[in-house]
Amino acid sequence: MRNVQETLLYKWFDKVWNKDDENAIDELMTDDAGAKGILADDQPKGASGFKIFFNDFRNQFHDIKIDVEEVISEDDFESARTTVSAIHTESGKQVSFAGMCMVRIVNGKIGEAWNNYDFLGLYQQLGQKLSPVE
């Protein structure tokens, strides 16, 4: 089993999120990468599209920390189980939620990503409730 700190996903979460390095997005993601579960189908792909999400999230939260609990790596795929913690800027509430990310690696960069994060749990921690559609 690979050392977690040697994996691309660990580097991604550490550089991009924990060290708040927007330039690392260009370094670690291809120009045409998709990011399911994060980017809408009509948003730009790749680093430029991800930067939209990155900056929107950073505008709403600060002191963002992503702990990489485990990484499984096989061939050109990596999958990570993570815990995100942050402070909601508007309310000052501390939040924490779990998530998983799987990526396909192309030439040493993220070429495609599938994300599954507990955004419902995040919204509940902020006091938001889902209402039925009428």
How should these model regions be labeled?
Residues 1-31, 130-134:
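Short, low-complexity N-terminal intrinsically disordered segments enriched in polar/charged residues
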Residues 2-4, 22-76:
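A solvent-exposed, acidic/Ser-Thr-rich amphipathic alpha-helical stretch
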Residues 9, 24-26, 33, 50, ...:
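Hydrophobic pocket/interface hotspot
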Residues 59, 63, 86-96:
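Short, cysteine-centered beta-strand-loop-beta hairpins and adjacent loop/turn segments enriched
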Residues 65-66, 81, 95-101:
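Short, surface-exposed coil-to-beta transition loops
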Residues 75-84:
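A short hydrophobic beta-strand element
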Residues 100, 115-116:
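Residue-level structural signal for beta-strand termini and adjacent loop
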Residues 116-134:
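Low-complexity, intrinsically disordered terminal/linker segments enriched in charged
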